[in-house]
């Protein structure tokens, strides 16, 4: 399984996946290829990928720099056990609180984040209110985490304690606390999260918290991980 950090619609950041032997990519938000409706740049990559790589698939958990109004109009499909929005026949956005069961991995997905630059953006044009992780998203994700088996969490943003350890408080924008609540509610009620990975912060950082390994991926950073691989070997920064 090919895990990929933020892309921001920069198609060159997808090349390694296209040239790899991996069939599936899980992209960790700020995918960015659905931003301006029918924009030629974004559609060019998506159409090229659909036509020329029919045996590969991209899944994204979505971030904050996405056009949620357009994405919410896309058809809903069940893919590998998860409710997804169909962007192309081989490109899907995984909805929040869904478990994607693929390549032997059960991945609990929770996209979304708050934009720190939204004051300079325009609602419905370059910023969308749906980016924020809602209380309903938190409840659904916790319920899935406590009732279903999973191997890891994939998010866009990272929990508040991760941010406070590694960044100044000005980067606390809201959704980090929702993610912290998800972590605590699962861990304090009999569940366990061995691995949590995300993007958003544009830095490669690893951190152990209790018995969970947290790992943020930089822009365009990749990690290839399979079911029987060592978490520490693959996700710790050596």
Short names for language-model regions:
Residues 103-174:
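Active-site-proximal loop/helix segment associated with metal-binding centers of metalloenzymes
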Residues 39-47, 135-141, 173-181:
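Well-ordered, non-membrane alpha-helical segments in soluble/globular domains
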Residues 8-14, 32-36, 62-72, 99-100, ...:
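Active-site environment of divalent metal-dependent phosphoester hydrolases
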Residues 57-61, 85-89, 161-236:
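Conserved beta-sheet core of the metallophosphoesterase superfamily
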């Amino acid at each position: 399984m090919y895990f990929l950090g933020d892309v921001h619609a920069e198609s060159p950041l997808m090349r390694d996946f296209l040239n790899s032997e991996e069939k599936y990519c899980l992209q960790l938000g700020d995918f960015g290829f659905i931003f301006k409706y029918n924009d030629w740049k974004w559609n060019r990559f998506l159409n090229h990928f659909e036509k020329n790589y029919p045996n590969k698939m991209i899944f994204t958990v979505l971030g904050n720099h996405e056009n949620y109004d357009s994405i919410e109009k896309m058809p809903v499909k069940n893919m590998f056990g998860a409710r997804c929005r169909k962007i192309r026949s081989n490109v899907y956005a995984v909805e929040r609180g869904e478990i994607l069961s693929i390549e032997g991995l059960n991945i609990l997905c929770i996209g979304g984040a708050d934009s720190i630059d939204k004051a300079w953006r325009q609602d419905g044009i370059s910023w969308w209110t749906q980016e924020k992780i809602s209380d309903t998203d938190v409840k659904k994700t916790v319920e899935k985490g406590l009732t279903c088996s999973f191997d890891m969490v994939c998010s866009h943003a990272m929990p508040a304690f991760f941010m406070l350890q590694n960044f100044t408080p000005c980067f606390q924008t809201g959704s980090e606390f929702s993610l912290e609540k998800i972590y605590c509610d699962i861990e304090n009620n009999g569940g366990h999260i061995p691995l949590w990975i995300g993007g958003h912060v544009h830095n490669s950082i690893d951190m152990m918290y209790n018995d969970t390994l947290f790992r943020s991926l930089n822009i365009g950073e990749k990690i290839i991980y399979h079911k029987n691989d060592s978490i520490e070997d693959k996700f710790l920064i050596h």
